[in-house]
Amino acid sequence: MNYTELEQKIGKQTESDWHQASGGGWIHKDAKVKNELNIRDNAIVMGNAQVYGDARVYGDAWVYDDARVYDDARVYGNALVYGDACVYDNAQVYGNAQVYDDARVYGNAQVYGDALVYSHAWVYGKSERD
């Protein structure tokens, strides 16, 4: 995805506020990403979001607001993680799933399909939510 395509997804932006990650995705200047190689494909990390450890965001996934993705977590497909949500340990969020507000997904949990995890919900261990 080039910058023009990025603008089509998120609206008019100042180009200098963005840079393309080494892995191919896009990172906003306010977001904190430990390893740019882990932001791949058309993924977007913006706002005050943080991605660190060996966490990966790829496909068409978005991580934004104050959300955090870390450890060995994966967010991919068309998944959205936002608000104050956290995805960590070996958790995976994918498909069209959304994790937001103060929700937590961790351990070996998987959230996928059209699942919504929000408010103060916790999904953990070997749980699956579709």
What is each of the regions a protein language model found here?
Residues 41-121:
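Thr-biased low-complexity repeat/linker tracts and other Thr-enriched repetitive architectures
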Residues 14, 30, 35, 51, ...:
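Intrinsic disorder/low-complexity segments enriched in polar/small residues
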Residues 1-52:
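Extended, small-residue-rich solenoid/repeat segments and analogous flexible loops
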